């Protein structure tokens, strides 16, 4: 039994089988899937990680302990908690984080090279604190750069490539990543969000919910989002067919809703926006540069029902053109890697004809 689509990646074919001894059910009360280990009688909401699959009894004990600790903290608090978003998330020093950043420095006015120069040292410092405080085991930063291919920026496909590469790399060079955080290069989290990075996402975590620009938009699901491997594969990742700014996050929300995955996020925390634009300014900036926008957004969203399970990780194709380190080695180990990739066209998809970097629809 499997729990997702087949993934025909750039080099290998993988599936998402439910681990031996585990079963999947649907909660009638909450109308969402859960996972059950028959022998230990352990139940959890999220797809089992490799560690959980191999040691369900230990997982059951650990989760019981974490729940007891949270209950003690809640009982001793004078503030009543009404939402999981207001609680301190549970962290584990078994977790390894992959920070996956889509990137291209094509338009000087976007200042992406300047943003990257600030992003790498900040994130290394931020994540190293989580390691030294024993909240996570390890991390690696992956900058996925789209080559100068004369096509519009394809954020969704770059994130899929980053996920695919990071997973394969960590399988060969343990520890295996358990947390995948899809991250914009111009957003710098501050220490008050550290635990939201370190916690295993039993359901997706929209960390950028607290970003000032979109904090009043409940439909926004971009900026910084944390996923487990299992949930990312269940929804077949991001769409590959959104060329230009906008739309891929909306499609991601549709995928979560289709497979009945709920998401969470902090209600407070600090993010420094290197662009330093409010929503009105950003929209005005894009209006002045219409060719950057996705000109197929609405048509691509309309085909969600018929294409979501075959447009994403399942048909991902790309070539790695260059791989380089972006940092000085820490104890002989680099913590930041840039991949320059050829994202390739998507089979015979109709949007291939509308992905040129200067494409605008005819009036």
Model-derived segments and spans:
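WW-domain-binding short linear motifs
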Residues: 1-33, 38-85
């Amino acid at each position: 039994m499997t729990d997702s689509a087949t993934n025909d990646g750039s080099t290998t074919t993988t599936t998402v089988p439910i681990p031996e001894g585990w079963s999947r059910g649907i909660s009638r009360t909450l109308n969402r899937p859960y996972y059950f280990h028959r022998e230990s009688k352990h139940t959890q909401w999220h797809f089992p990680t490799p560690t959980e699959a191999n040691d369900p009894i230990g997982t059951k004990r650990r989760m019981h302990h974490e729940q007891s600790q949270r209950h003690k903290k809640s009982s001793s608090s004078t503030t009543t908690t009404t939402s999981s978003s207001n609680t301190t998330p549970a962290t584990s020093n078994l977790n390894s984080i992959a920070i996956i950043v889509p990137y291209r420095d094509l338009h000087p006015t976007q200042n992406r090279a300047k943003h990257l120069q600030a992003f790498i040292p900040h994130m290394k410092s931020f994540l190293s604190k989580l390691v030294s405080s024993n909240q996570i085991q390890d991390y690696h930063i992956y900058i996925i750069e789209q080559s100068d291919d004369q096509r519009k920026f394809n954020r969704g496909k770059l994130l899929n490539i980053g996920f695919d590469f990071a997973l394969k790399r960590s399988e060969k060079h343990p520890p295996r990543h358990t947390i995948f955080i899809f991250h914009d290069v111009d957003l710098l989290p501050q220490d008050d969000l550290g635990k939201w990075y370190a916690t295993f996402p039993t359901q997706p975590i929209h960390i950028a919910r607290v970003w000032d620009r979109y904090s009043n938009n409940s439909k926004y699901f971009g900026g910084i989002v944390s996923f487990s491997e299992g949930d990312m594969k269940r929804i077949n990742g991001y769409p590959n067919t959104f060329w230009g700014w906008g739309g891929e996050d909306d499609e991601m929300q549709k995928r979560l809703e289709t497979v009945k995955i709920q998401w969470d996020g902090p209600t407070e925390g600090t993010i420094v926006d290197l662009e330093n634009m409010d929503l009105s300014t950003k929209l005005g900036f894009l209006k002045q540069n219409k060719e950057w926008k996705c000109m197929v957004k609405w048509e691509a969203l309309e085909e969600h029902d018929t294409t979501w399970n075959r447009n994403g990780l399942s048909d991902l194709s790309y070539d790695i053109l260059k791989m380089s380190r972006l940092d000085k080695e820490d104890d002989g180990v680099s913590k930041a890697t840039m991949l320059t990739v050829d994202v390739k066209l998507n089979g015979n998809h109709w949007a291939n004809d509308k992905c040129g970097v200067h494409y605008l629809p005819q009036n």
